[in-house]
Design a protein with these regions (language model features):
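N-terminal loops that bind phosphate or other acidic moieties
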Residues: 2-64, 68-142
Length: 142
């Protein structure tokens, strides 16, 4: 089953990610970017999301939201709540979203959601400086 991805969030979150995703992975007609701007209502966002779902009838849908518990998340959950072919995730980083874009038609939407959450956890790190006297083997890379 084909999977479409809806990226949504506050302000220009979604369209900002669109710029990065298209730079790194190219354009993809199965990705939708829905911003919730200051004068938008939850009902307006719900209508946009519902239109994407209707346009892609028969496809699985993964909603990627900026913040757990925010309006885009709540609206996504409301739409996905009664469907076995829709999932909602929140707080994923660009690396995990890119992984999801490349995996989306190879695994189920549930596996995709789980994979993206795991990837975000695994790739969120804090850089630690290396002792200046430590010799680093250039063959090891960064």
């Amino acid at each position: 089953m084909k999977t479409v991805i809806v990226i949504t969030g506050h302000g220009n979150y979604a369209t900002g990610l669109k710029s990065s995703i298209e730079l790194l992975a190219g354009q993809n007609g199965d990705l939708y970017y829905l911003d919730l701007m200051v004068n938008d209502t939850d009902q307006m966002l719900k209508e946009q999301m519902t239109n994407v779902v209707k346009k892609n009838k028969g496809s699985s849908v993964l909603f990627i939201c900026d913040i757990l518990g925010g309006t885009p998340f709540k609206v996504s959950v409301e739409i996905a709540n009664n469907s076995d072919h829709m999932e909602v995730v929140a707080g994923c980083n660009i690396g995990s979203i890119l992984e999801g874009v490349f995996q989306k038609d190879k695994i189920s939407v549930r596996e995709l959601a789980d994979s993206m959450v795991s990837s975000s956890k695994r790739t969120t790190v804090r850089f630690e400086t290396v002792n200046k006297n430590t010799v680093i083997d250039p063959e090891e890379g960064i």
